[in-house]
Each structure stands twice: as C-alpha cells, then as structure tokens.
Amino acid sequence: MAVLFRDQTKSALEALLFVASEPLTVQALARIVEIDVADALELLLELAKEYQDRPGGLKIVQVSDTWQICTRPECAPYIERLYRKSGTGLSKAAIETLAIIAYRQPITRSEVEMIRGVKVDSPINTLLERNLIEEKGRREGPGRPVLYGTTLEFLKHFGLKDVSELPPLEEFLVEGETIDI
C-alpha cells in the first residue's frame, strides 16, 4: 500500500470511528474504505497504537470483534460534569450482582441469590434496563430458568475486549480470605 494512500486510508478509518454512534467491525470498515480486511486490521492496530502513545482524551479500542473511538477513563469526571444526570450510578446491590454475573456467567437468578443471600429482582432489572446484562438462554431442567450474562455494552463500559480480560478475583480478596468458584 503506497504511503500517501495508506495515510489517507488511516485518516478515513479514524474519521469513520469518530462519527459512528456504534462500534464498527473490521469487515464493515474495510468495505467502506475499499481495502482488504487484513489491511484494515493492520491500519486499525497502527491507529490504536498511535492513540495509545500520545497524550490526549481519546483512545481507540477493540470491543469483541468491533472497533471504536472512546474517551480515556481519566477524563470521565469531566464528561460526567458535562452530562450530569442525577441518580445514574448503580447501587451496591446492582454492582455486586453485576460482578457475580460477570465472573460466573451464564448464571441463573436463583444462583445469584444463593451467592448474595438475598433476592436480586431489582438489581437484575436495573442491569437489564441499562443493557449491562442480557438473557443468554435457558438452563435445562425444572422450570428452565433464564441464564444471564454480560453484554457488549458491559465490555464497552469497562473497556474490555472480552470477559477473559476481567481482573482475577484474587486481586479483590483481603489477605487470608478465600473464595469458592
């Protein structure tokens, strides 16, 4: 790929990521700029590295099999002030429920309740409304209970490519504490 064409194509990819309201697949980006998927991926990786290596409020991230431009976490307090919404945080119960679902997915409501020791109807409804979790199917057996798991929105919100990038649970334990998984 010629240098001038390469730079123009990389600029076009950057512009597409900037204006897109949703993450875009490499295949869609390659089709739009009329290059091979492998070349598009190479340019996206270069672009992501450039954003990573320079100071600024933006970064390019891969979320599952899609790409997007997003703000750096350290800019969040300023963005929150711009879009201040009262009561947008998750409750402690919702955060605990989300953590259980993220680490144990797919998991049923009753399994979450067994771990937390309390009903989780309200936290699960909140997480569903915020599109952080979704129904992933049904467990075989009596009643065929719904299985819950995290969404692409969850991955985007926490800046993860996939759930394998979740930090190990051991990082959250106090010295001497154990956890059953």
From Swiss-Prot:
Q: In UniProt terms, what function does this protein have?
A: Participates in chromosomal partition during cell division. May act via the formation of a condensin-like complex containing Smc and ScpA that pull DNA away from mid-cell into both cell halves.
| Statement: the UniProt record of this protein carries the keyword Cell division | yes
Subunit annotation: Homodimer. Homodimerization may be required to stabilize the binding of ScpA to the Smc head domains. Component of a cohesin-like complex composed of ScpA, ScpB and the Smc homodimer, in which ScpA and ScpB bind to the head domain of Smc. The presence of the three proteins is required for the association of the complex with DNA.
Supply the HAMAP family for this chain.
ScpB
Signal peptide start-end: none
Q: Where in the cell is it found?
A: Cytoplasm
Q: Which UniProt keywords apply?
A: Cell cycle, Cell division, Chromosome partition, Cytoplasm
Question: How is this protein named in the record?
Answer: Segregation and condensation protein B
- InterPro entries the UniProt entry points to: ScpB_csome_segregation, WH-like_DNA-bd_sf, WH_DNA-bd_sf
Q: One Pfam match, by short name?
A: SMC_ScpB
Family, per the entry?
Belongs to the ScpB family.
Keyword check for Phosphoprotein: no
One GO biological-process annotation of the entry reads: cell division
Q: Which NCBIfam families match?
A: SMC-Scp complex subunit ScpB (TIGR00281)
Q: Which GO terms describe its cellular component?
A: cytoplasm
